[in-house]
Regions:
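Non-catalytic, mostly N-terminal accessory regions of nucleic-acid modification and defense proteins
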Residues: 1-201, 268-277, 385-388, 410-418, ...
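Conserved, well-folded catalytic cores of nucleic-acid-processing
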Residues: 16, 150, 154, 171, ...
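A conserved structural/catalytic subdomain of Rossmann-like adenosyl-cofactor enzymes
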Residues: 279-280, 284-289, 293-480
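A structure-centric signal for secondary-structure junctions around beta-strands
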Residues: 30, 165, 210, 240, ...
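Helical mechanochemical/support elements of P-loop NTPase systems and associated helical scaffolds
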Residues: 6, 13, 25-26, 143, ...
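Conserved S-adenosyl-L-methionine
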Residues: 184-304, 309-311, 320-324, 337, ...
Length: 480
C-alpha cells in the first residue's frame, strides 16, 4: 500500500468514525493521537539505538530516575512503557480510555524543562476532547481503540518516514478542511497556494546559508513547513532553518507545534507562541516580562494567510513601530494591520508573501492611506491575483502580495493568475503548470505577457490615484 492509498483509507475510515462530531473538532483527536504515536515511536527508536531491546522495555518506568533523566535530555520527554502507543495496541481488549488520560497527564509532567515551549500543553485539546468521543466509558474506549488501530500502521520511526507521515498528516488536514465549512480557513492554506508562496520565497533566499522564517497566523503550520522544505532544497541543510510561529486559537496552535515536530524539525529550531499577533508585538519577548524583554526580531521571510477582513482594536497603536510609518487599518478590517506586522518583521533584505482579499488593492479611507505609503516607500514587489473559490470555506477573491524593504526598481509586477486552474469538487485548484507559470513570471519580471502579467510603473500607479486595480491587467478584479 503506497502513501496515497494509506492516507485515503485512513481518511475514509475516520470520516465514518467521527459520526456526529464536527470535522473541525474530530481532526484534533486523530491528529493528536498521530502525534502521540510519533513521539512514542521516536522514544522507542532512540532506546533501541542505545542498547535497549524489546525484552528490557517493560523496565522503562518513572521509578528509574537515571533512565528517566537520560531519555528526557536526549528525546525531550519521557513516556513509560505502560504509556507507550505500542503498549496500548498490545493490550487488545484490556485497553481502556482511562489509559490515555493517565498517559497524557504523565507526558505533561515529564517534559524536559529545555523543551517545555515545544511540548507543554500540546495535548490539551485532545485531553479535553476525549469525553466527546462517547457518552459512557465503554463507548469512549471503543471510539479511542478504533482510532489508535486506524493509525497504528503509519510508519513513523525513520528519516524516510517523515515524507509518508507528512503526506498523511497534510492529506487529513486538507480533507478535514474541505469538510469544515467556514472554519477551514482558521487552520489550513491549500497545498498549491503554499507551494506557490514557497517557490517565490525560496527563490529570494536561495543564496543564504542560514535563515529565519515566521508565520504570525500559523494555523496548522503547513505553510511554514512548505516554505522551509522549499528553501532547504537550495540550502542543502534544513537544520539551518529556524521556524517562528504564532497562532491565536489554542487547538490550532497545538497543530502548528505537532506538525513542525513531526516533519523532523529540531525542537531547538522551533519557537512558537499562542497569542494575538495584532496586540502585543511578537517576536520577541519573554512571557513573564513582555515589556522589559521586548526585543523585536527581524527575519528573512514572513509568510501568512491571515483571517480576511476581521475586526481588530487599533486603539493606542498610533506610535506602535509596526504601524507608525504607514497608518492604522480601520477597526472593521485588519488586513493591512497583518500586512504591516509582517513587513515590520523582515530584515532589510527580507521578503513577505501574504494572502489578502482583493479589496486591499482599491478600498479608500485608512486603507487608501496605508496603500499610498506602501507605494511611496517602494515596498510592494508583486501582486498575484488567484482564482476564485481556491480556499476552503470562502469564495472571496484573493491575491498574494509580495513585499520587500530594499527594492532596486520602483515597478510593481501584477500577475493575473485567476484563469489558470482545474475544478476539484466545489473548489478550484492551481495545477503544477499554473504554479510554474506564475513563478517564472515573478522571477523574470517581464514588461508584459498578454492577458497574464505586466510591470506597472510607480508613475502609472500614482496617476491611478494609488489604486492597484490596474486595467487591463487585473482580470481577477473583474476590471478591464
Amino acid at each position: 500500500m503506497n502513501k496515497q492509498q494509506l492516507a485515503s483509507k485512513i481518511w475514509e475510515s475516520a470520516n465514518k468514525m467521527r459520526s456526529k462530531i464536527e470535522a473541525n473538532e474530530y481532526k484534533d483527536y486523530i491528529l493528536g493521537f498521530m502525534f502521540y504515536k510519533f513521539l512514542s515511536d521516536k522514544e522507542v527508536k532512540w532506546l533501541k539505538e542505545n542498547d535497549w531491546t524489546d525484552e528490557y522495555l517493560p523496565d522503562l518506568t518513572e521509578d528509574d530516575a537515571e533512565t528517566l533523566d537520560t531519555v528526557r535530555k536526549n528525546v525531550g520527554y519521557f513516556i513509560a512503557y505502560e504509556n507507550l502507543f505500542s503498549t496500548w495496541i498490545s493490550k487488545g481488549s484490556d485497553f481502556k480510555a482511562d489509559d490515555v488520560t493517565v498517559a497524557l497527564q504523565a507526558f505533561s509532567r515529564l517534559i524536559d524543562p529545555h523543551h517545555k515551549k515545544v511540548f507543554d500543553g500540546v495535548f490539551a485539546t485532545l485531553q479535553t476532547g476525549l469525553s466527546k468521543l462517547g457518552e459512557s466509558s465503554g463507548a469512549r474506549t471503543k471510539a479511542i481503540r478504533d482510532l489508535i488501530y486506524l493509525i497504528k500502521d503509519i510508519p513513523m520511526d525513520g528519516k524516510q518516514d517523515y515524507d509518508v507521515l507528512g503526506f498523511i498528516y497534510e492529506y487529513l488536514i486538507s480533507n478535514f478542511a474541505a469538510n469544515a465549512g467556514k472554519k477551514a480557513g482558521e487552520f489550513y492554506t491549500p497545498h498549491e497556494v503554499s507551494l506557490l508562496m514557497s517557490e517565490i520565497v525560496a527563490y529570494h533566499l536561495k543564496d543564504r546559508e542560514e535563515i529565519k522564517i515566521y508565520d504570525p497566523t500559523s494555523g496548522s503550520g503547513s505553510l511554514l513547513i512548505n516554505i522551509g522544505q522549499c528553501a532547504a532544497r537550495y540550502m542543502g541543510n534544513g537544520n539551518n532553518i529556524k521556524y517562528y510561529a504564532q497562532e491565536l486559537k489554542e487547538n490550532t496552535y497545538n497543530l502548528t507545534r505537532m506538525n513542525l515536530v513531526m516533519r523532523g524539525i529540531l525542537p531547538d529550531n522551533i519557537v512558537t507562541r499562542n497569542g494575538d499577533t495584532l496586540e502585543e508585538d511578537w517576536p520577541y519577548f519573554e512571557e513573564n516580562d513582555p515589556v522589559n524583554t521586548y526585543d523585536p526580531l527581524f527575519v528573512d521571510a514572513v509568510v501568512s494567510n491571515p483571517p480576511y477582513s476581521q475586526a481588530w482594536n487599533p486603539n493606542d497603536k498610533e506610535n506602535n513601530p509596526r504601524f507608525s510609518d504607514y497608518g492604522l487599518a480601520p477597526k472593521g478590517k485588519a488586513d493591512y494591520a497583518f500586512l504591516l506586522h509582517d513587513l515590520y518583521h523582515i530584515r532589510n533584505d527580507g521578503i513577505v508573501t501574504i494572502v489578502l482579499p482583493h479589496g486591499v488593492l482599491f478600498r479608500g479611507g485608512e486603507e487608501g492611506t496605508i496603500r499610498k505609503n506602501l507605494i511611496d516607500h517602494n515596498n510592494i514587489d508583486a501582486i498575484i491575483g488567484l482564482p476564485a473559490n481556491i480556499f476552503f470555506g470562502t469564495g472571496i477573491p484573493t491575491i498574494i502580495m509580495v513585499l520587500r524593504k530594499n527594492k532596486k526598481d520602483s515597478d510593481v509586477l501584477i500577475i493575473d493568475a485567476s484563469k489558470g486552474f482545474e475544478k476539484d469538487g466545489k473548489n478550484n485548484k492551481l495545477r503544477a503548470c499554473d504554479i510554474k507559470r506564475i513563478v517564472d513570471a515573478y522571477k523574470e519580471r517581464p514588461e508584459k505577457i498578454k492577458k497574464f502579467a505586466r510591470r506597472v510603473s510607480r508613475a502609472e500607479i500614482i496617476q491611478n490615484d494609488y489604486n492597484l486595480n490596474i486595467p487591463p491587467v487585473c482580470g481577477f478584479l473583474g476590471k478591464g
